[in-house]
Amino acid sequence: MSDRIDRDVINALIAGHFADPFSVLGMHKTTAGLEVRALLPDATDVWVIEPKTGRKLAKLECLDSRGFFSGVIPRRKNFFRYQLAVVWHGQQNLIDDPYRFGPLIQEMDAWLLSEGTHLRPYETLGAHADTMDGVTGTRFSVWAPNARRVSVVGQFNYWDGRRHPMRLRKESGIWELFIPGAHNGQLYKYEMIDANGNLRLKSDPYAFEAQMRPETASLICGLPEKVVQTEERKKANQFDAPISIYEVHLGSWRRHTDNNFWLSYRELADQLVPYAKWMGFTHLELLPINEHPFDGSWGYQPTGLYAPTRRFGTRDDFRYFIDAAHAAGLNVILDWVPGHFPTDDFALAEFDGTNLYEHSDPREGYHQDWNTLIYNYGRREVSNFLVGNALYWIERFGIDALRVDAVASMIYRDYSRKEGEWIPNEFGGRENLEAIEFLRNTNRILGEQVSGAVTMAEESTDFPGVSRPQDMGGLGFWYKWNLGWMHDTLDYMKLDPIYRQYHHDKLTFGMLYNYTENFVLPLSHDEVVHGKKSILDRMPGDAWQKFANLRAYYGWMWAFPGKKLLFMGNEFAQGREWNHDASLDWHLLEGGDNWHHGVQRLVRDLNLTYRHHKAMHELDFDPYGFEWLVVDDKERSVLIFVRRDKEGNEIIVASNFTPVPRHDYRFGINQPGKWREILNTDSMHYHGSNAGNGGAVHSDEIASHGRQHSLSLTLPPLATIWLVREAE
């Protein structure tokens, strides 16, 4: 019988260098009849078994002591179901032969994957528990077109790459194999001989769960059930909705006090979710929770884009957290990182021995600042991997929005590069046309497939139309972070009040471009690290003035057009920079009422008042929703404006950014009547000096600032006040 199989083929198969195992293993028609061949290292005896009766049909002959068996089934001409009875170390085991099953991926799926238009590639690629021909197991599929051989290794086969080599689908470059008996919870990887002949162990790019660092294996895990979007969650993302985002790093929001260990997803559901709800926030934004090897990356260098990190629990635990947030009325935003990935050898880098996911030229494919690799967006399968991932988090976990990280680094080829360190596009320009098309396509698909979910761009340049529709030349994001506003206003606030009059335009300039994008006003994690100090510590003056400045700034921010974002700890004025390895300084809220409690109460009241009054959020992106009343009083550092809703109801916002109270400050108004003070950052409730206007003030028919009626107010020191007109 040995003449039927070439000895070189057997040697290559056993050595793990044979690329087409299905041409040899399994059941085949030969001139001698139906022949079954199996590679079973360490086996001593093998029989072909009839599943229904358990009858032994034939004993396979050992053609190679390293585990290659073959035998002809007598009196059989047509293929049939069979099992193998295998003796290992004196123990007989009944197994199903992986090599008796046909191709796994349907032709249409293979076509769409190759074309890069498969909306949900994760439903085909990766590891999926399945039943084939009555046999339960797991089907594995991985894209590695340049690999010479790929095997599945894991807890089900002693991590032995000889035991389960995969079938290559040449039309798509995908390797596939159904392994009977492999089940949810088992660890696995792909072992491959790469394009250069090197042996590699790779995690599954499409793994739904992964081991916690420093381990790097993937886990077989069922695809999560779809989460249905609700109308309430859709409405909470709309342009006219109040959006106040609490940005959180799950690993350092709060830790166990006895061992400084993280809270689990379920503990966070029980503690973080009710806290954010009580504080009045509408959205939770999570720094990336994709699996990542390095804690210090904060999640922004992911290796498991489809797997929630195991640091805080399982995939189901994360689903529990999301469900708890939704039950509390909070939408969830996930920081999403399609811009780059780390160089770790177990992940995407040189996946099949070639630059499969990244560009080959480091001038296109390497981030010097972060020591990471840049996705090749022009490769259809790569962009499909990323677009599918966006849909995956929204559809399978109920994520309500994706905040896309570092967009500027994606859309500019010369981002953080000197001359000669980057390659122009085909037209000689600096724009990364493939990345731009990828972002437009992603936003288009999300708009079509999961209407109601939105995307937000962290984009640090003046690239036009980031949050404008694709048919208008835009990128199609729903919102864009206003980093210019953030830098200008923080630069202003850190000044001694005596010098602020010379930088008045830092607070007014934002309105000159306010309606070019749909802006979010971010005080994010990036502003409290790397020596920048905390937001509180940037404020000038003694302790009283620092807190007063911060309260005035928050009052200004919550009133200014744009959605709001505040990083954790800033809501109670944490004094030190953020440390990802430690809990927030919750002890600042212990030991009785203090300034930190005052800021915390203010942020809560800002959220609740902002949400209650439509004028503060309904027309953020419509010029009718805002009007300056006093814009040029730079000598006294006073700014006053109106926020307006669709029905014309107004709220007056007045800020005094000096420590000098301004008594009898008169300015013109649009609507005469009684104006009630609904928020005062100088209130004693927030540990201010309690200067103000006695709760309400009536307008006078005295012309001022070109208007027939006016108000005369007391503007408290270093404070912002909000007033609403009461009905007659």
Curated annotation (Swiss-Prot):
GO MF terms, alphabetically ordered = 1,4-alpha-glucan branching enzyme activity; cation binding; hydrolase activity, hydrolyzing O-glycosyl compounds
A GO BP entry is: glycogen biosynthetic process
GO terms for cellular component = cytosol
Q: Which reaction does it catalyse?
A: Transfers a segment of a (1->4)-alpha-D-glucan chain to a primary hydroxy group in a similar glucan chain
Is this entry keyworded Transferase?
yes
Give the record's subunit note. Monomer.
The role this protein plays is: Catalyzes the formation of the alpha-1,6-glucosidic linkages in glycogen by scission of a 1,4-alpha-linked oligosaccharide from growing alpha-1,4-glucan chains and the subsequent attachment of the oligosaccharide to the alpha-1,6 position.
* Listed name of the protein: 1,4-alpha-glucan branching enzyme GlgB
> Which classification does the entry list for the species?
Bacteria, Pseudomonadati, Pseudomonadota, Gammaproteobacteria, Enterobacterales
Source gene?
glgB
